[in-house]
């Protein structure tokens, strides 16, 4: 009767109940007064809106002071969250966590222990406590137990309740019974329907959307890199982040069904390459951080091998080239080797074949001219050659990315880079004044063309890729001494590939580079040939014999065979082809031939000839063609291939 009387007084006071409840519902969920144990009247008066204050002022002796009306208004206001979602209050943000909430797990095995309970929720986040108690619903059965797991967030407890409810055998096949799941508000001891949140996630009829549907979860799991985690509406809650205020209803609706990548389709492959494993529970903020800072998986930091080489002393260069592992590791870890199998990344320099010589920078960049100018010669032009098919079809490329020339720089050094996977070797050589054609003829300052040592196997031959770069040097302490020489040495070691059947040495002594640097150039312009496995022996005395030469070269490592013949000429004795004895020596590999050239250049034959000692001994140079190969095209085809034809005879 008092309730009806109070409603009559309320109608007489000309205050609409809907207006009072609507305004009060806007303030009640935003306050935390309901979370503290306090009297109902005090709690309600603290959070009541101005509409009820007006009621008190209009009728101080009426229903406002009655506890029944106060409790009625309080109950009606706090219970609006259980509406059908169509009233005015359903649009208000009233789903504020006033927990904690308890997840109850019943129908358990008889021998369950607390340790097993912790194992079940070991991967769950936001767990406050886990208890194993006797079930109060079965007071006469002491064996019935219940697992009570306390969560601080409604989104977390409903999320894990749905997961457990979807499992038919939580405890394995030995206990093939479905466990019963309940969610209870610890303060009010009222059950919470966690399945309601699942259905509302698909109908979008109520703002209580803490959980996406199961089909949406499967789609998100299949697209782990497109996962969206936003506040309480996440399918994989994140503990403290779930207690933050939810976004607005419009943004929530737009995000709830947005399963595509919000950061762009082009970043999917980057995230898959940079992050090997990404959990579904990653937040949107963390995912954006991952996409903006990609790191190549499994790739070590690359080092600048060319710069580290030029920063060394001269003695250290020899050690690094022949015996050092650092340069080998640098080349092995370089992105150039990876670019042969996959598209180049942004850090890989792009070849510009028609660019100027100073604009092309190789993969192994060199230091500036200010670094150790007195110890090492500053770089000016350098390039790296690759096995590109269109280069082979253009034999007259000028100013290409292969070798750049500059008449103002007198001396060059060509180094073939060591490959870590194939354990290749290289020898430093000094040449001068490089023209820009593919004949690679290097001329000295006095106008005599000299021998060249290009990286021919990677330019002209459709074989395996070899790496090299051209380094120019100008050492002020040795310029005068170098100008006195008629020309400079011609030698270069070519890499031995794993996929070839050529037997080659894997280690070269440290003194080989120093020996090669002291080798004078061939005096005859016809001796300027690219490196191959066959050496031409020049400046032989007229009475030289095959036995002497065989005795001299047979002790060299990698020696294969020797071809000797006498070809006398009426022009007298000279220092080149067609005069006196002719000898060609074939080795198993270019590296063996290069080593023999460095060690035996200028040597005397076993039988001394005093009249010829002042001529400097024998002069070695690379043969135009490998032994047994003839033809004008062999220079561009077979002369650069150390796995194609030098085994023939």
Curated annotation (Swiss-Prot):
Post-translational modification: Phosphorylated by PKA in vitro.
Any one of the GO BP annotations: mRNA destabilization
Disulfide bonds: none
Sequence segments annotated as region (Disordered): 196-217, 228-247, 438-461, 604-649
Polar residues bias locations: 228-238, 631-649
CC terms in the record's Gene Ontology section: cytoplasm
Domain of life assignment: Eukaryota
Record domain RRM: where: 533-625
Family annotation (SMART domains): RRM
Coiled-coil blocks: none
CDD domains with a match to the protein in the record: RRM_scw1_like
GO molecular function: mRNA binding
Subcellular location: Cytoplasm
Induction record: Cell cycle-regulated. Expression peaks during S/G2 phase.
Entry keywords, A to Z: Cytoplasm, Phosphoprotein, RNA-binding
Major site of localization recorded for this protein: cytoplasm
UniProt-listed InterPro entries: Nucleotide-bd_a/b_plait_sf (IPR012677), RBD_domain_sf (IPR035979), RRM_dom (IPR000504)
Modified residues (Phosphoserine): 22, 206, 258, 283
Function noted in UniProt: Has a partially redundant function to WHI3, a dosage-dependent modulator of cell size.
Official protein name in the record: Protein WHI4
Organism encoding this protein: Saccharomyces cerevisiae (strain ATCC 204508 / S288c)
Record gene name: WHI4
């Amino acid at each position: 009767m008092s309730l009806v009387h109070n409603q009559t007084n309320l109608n007489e006071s000309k205050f609409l109940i809907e207006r009072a409840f609507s305004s009060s519902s806007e303030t009640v969920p935003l306050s935390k007064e309901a979370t503290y144990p306090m009297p109902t009247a005090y709690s309600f008066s603290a959070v009541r809106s101005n509409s009820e204050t007006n009621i008190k002022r209009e009728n101080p002796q009426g229903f406002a002071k009655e506890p029944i009306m106060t409790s009625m208004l309080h109950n009606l206001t706090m219970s609006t969250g259980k509406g059908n979602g169509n009233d005015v209050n359903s649009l208000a943000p009233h789903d504020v966590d006033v927990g904690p909430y308890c997840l109850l797990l019943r129908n358990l095995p008889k021998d369950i222990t607390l340790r097993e309970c912790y194992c079940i929720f070991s991967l769950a986040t936001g767990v406050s406590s886990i208890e194993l108690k006797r079930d109060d619903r079965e007071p006469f059965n002491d064996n019935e137990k219940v697992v009570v797991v306390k969560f601080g967030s409604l989104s977390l407890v409903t999320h894990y309740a749905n997961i457990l409810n979807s499992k038919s055998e939580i405890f394995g096949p030995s206990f093939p019974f479905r466990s019963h799941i309940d969610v209870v508000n610890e303060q009010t001891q009222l059950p919470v329907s966690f399945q309601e949140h699942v259905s509302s996630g698909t109908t979008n009829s109520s703002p209580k959307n803490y959980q996406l549907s199961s089909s949406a979860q499967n789609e998100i799991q299949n697209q782990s890199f497109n996962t969206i985690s936003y506040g309480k509406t996440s399918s994989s809650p994140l503990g403290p982040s779930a207690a933050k205020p939810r976004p607005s209803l419009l943004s929530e609706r737009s995000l709830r069904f947005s399963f595509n990548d919000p950061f762009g389709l082009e970043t999917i492959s980057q995230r898959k390459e940079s992050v090997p494993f990404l959990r579904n529970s990653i937040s949107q903020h963390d995912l954006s951080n991952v996409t903006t800072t990609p790191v190549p998986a499994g790739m070590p930091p690359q080092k600048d091998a060319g710069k580290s080489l030029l920063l060394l002393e001269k003695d250290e260069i020899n050690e690094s080239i022949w015996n050092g592992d650092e340069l080998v590791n640098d080349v092995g870890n370089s992105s150039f080797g990876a670019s042969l199998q996959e598209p180049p990344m942004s850090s890989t320099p792009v070849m510009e074949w028609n660019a100027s010589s100073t604009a092309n920078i190789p993969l192994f960049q060199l230091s500036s001219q200010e670094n150790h100018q007195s110890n090492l010669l500053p770089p000016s032009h350098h390039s790296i050659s690759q096995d590109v098919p269109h280069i082979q079809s253009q034999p007259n490329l000028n100013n290409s990315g292969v070798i750049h020339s500059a008449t103002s720089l007198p001396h060059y050094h060509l180094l073939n880079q060591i490959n870590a996977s194939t354990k290749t070797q290289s020898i430093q050589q000094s040449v001068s004044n490089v023209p820009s054609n593919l004949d690679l003829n290097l001329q000295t300052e006095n106008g005599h063309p000299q021998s060249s040592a290009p990286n021919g196997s990677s330019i002209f031959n459709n074989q395996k890729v070899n790496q090299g770069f051209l380094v120019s040097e100008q050492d002020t302490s040795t310029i005068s001494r170098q100008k006195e020489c008629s020309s400079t040495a011609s030698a270069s070691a070519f890499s031995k590939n794993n996929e070839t059947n050529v037997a080659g040495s894997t280690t070269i002594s440290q003194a080989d580079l120093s020996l090669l640097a002291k080798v004078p150039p061939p005096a005859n312009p016809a001796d300027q040939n690219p490196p191959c496995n066959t050496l031409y022996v020049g400046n032989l005395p007229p009475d030289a014999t095959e036995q002497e030469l065989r005795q001299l070269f047979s002790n060299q490592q990698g020696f294969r065979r020797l071809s000797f013949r006498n070809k006398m000429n009426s022009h007298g004795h000279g220092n080149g082809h067609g005069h006196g004895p002719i000898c060609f020596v074939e080795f198993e590999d270019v590296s063996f031939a290069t080593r023999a050239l460095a060690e035996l250049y200028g040597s005397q034959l076993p039988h001394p000839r005093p009249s010829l000692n002042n001529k400097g001994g024998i002069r070695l140079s690379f043969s135009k063609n490998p032994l047994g190969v003839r033809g004008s095209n062999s220079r561009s085809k077979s002369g650069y291939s150390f796995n194609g034809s030098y085994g023939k005879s």
